[in-house]
Amino acid sequence: MINPNPKRSDEPVFWGLFGAGGMWSAIVAPVIILLVAILLPLGLFPGEALGYERVLAFASSFIGRVFIFLMIVLPLWLGLHRIHHAMHDLKIHVPNGKWVFYGLATILTVVTLVAIVTI
């Protein structure tokens, strides 16, 4: 018999943020690390393309702020979700682990949002 009042789960929201963080960390973050940490210092990427004025102008624009926000927040959700489930798999039971890890991710997301808005 089908339960007429099924219990709703909040897990799809967290899995969505986890999945988005995983895709971002796999596709976008390596490109940025390659550009900023390898190609630019070796002189294989024109330095004036990432000059201070251009980077500041990009970071001050709406698209730049969204990019920086996503560059910080999505990997953060990925990492905290992985830590939460790793603790569960290792049978290290954190009291109210869901509140601890997802609450920390939410707090850090709000802190990042405030920081990005006030740039």
From Swiss-Prot:
According to the record, the segments passing through the membrane are 26-46, 58-78, 99-119
Which GO terms of type biological process are on file?
Answer: fumarate metabolic process
Compartments (UniProt record): Cell inner membrane
The record, for Pfam families, names:
Fumarate_red_D
What is the membrane topology listed in the Swiss-Prot or TrEMBL record? Multi-pass membrane protein
Of which family is this protein a member?
Belongs to the FrdD family.
The protein's name in its UniProt record: Fumarate reductase subunit D
Q: Which gene specifies this protein's sequence?
A: frdD
